[in-house]
Regions:
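Long, low-complexity interaction regions most often at the N-terminus
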Residues: 1-88
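Charge-rich, solvent-exposed alpha-helical interaction surfaces
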Residues: 49, 107, 111, 126-130, ...
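Positively charged, polyanion-binding regions of nucleic-acid-associated proteins
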Residues: 99-118
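Short, charged amphipathic recognition helices of the HTH superfamily
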Residues: 114-134
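Short, basic interhelical loop/turn and adjoining N-cap
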Residues: 131-144
Length: 169
């Protein structure tokens, strides 16, 4: 089992560890400072990002990994050998971080809309519930997530209006 550790936004690391708590290779040892590795299935998009973005360890890079999230590298039958391709560079980590953010926001937006329109729960209360569930309290401002959600809703509504106006032409 080859692992890779890198730094991402703290709230995304908290989200990933709760979201994939059933996919942890080793439960956290209270006496160890190392993080448990998340072992993703090949049906999850981030698995493929890890596989495609892993490169051989550069000779000038330190072997001491630092960061706030650890993954078990994919070990497909065909393709890259994780014993050789075991390094995620800074630019690759940013790409993976963006994929995690997209996954988190998709889940958040679906949660907010479902709670509002199926259960009558206000967006603010749903946002608090989501942030608490994923241990992101104090790591991210709920207001910034809410503003991003409102921008997304506005964009979707404008696209819908545009598509409807094109149909009538």
């Amino acid at each position: 089992m080859v692992t890779v550790t890198f730094q991402i936004k703290p709230y995304l690391a908290a989200y990933m560890y709760v979201r994939y708590k059933n996919h942890l290779d080793v439960p956290p040892d209270r006496f160890s400072s190392s993080l448990s590795a998340i072992h993703l299935l090949d049906t999850q998009p981030i698995y493929h990002f890890l596989h495609q973005l892993s490169i051989p360890h550069p000779p000038n890079a330190s072997w001491h990994e630092t960061g706030n999230i650890t993954f078990t590298l994919p070990h497909p039958r065909n393709g890259k050998n994780p014993n050789v391709y075991n390094y995620i560079g800074h630019d690759s980590a940013l790409i993976i971080e963006k994929a995690m953010e997209v996954e988190m926001k998709a889940e958040l937006y679906e949660f907010l809309l479902e709670n509002k329109y199926c259960h009558g729960i206000m967006f603010k209360k749903s946002m608090e519930t989501f942030v608490e569930h994923y241990n992101m309290v104090g790591l991210v401002e709920e207001e910034s997530l809410m503003r991003a959600f409102q921008r997304w809703r506005k964009m979707v509504k404008e696209e819908k209006k545009l598509n409807l106006s094109l149909i009538h032409i």
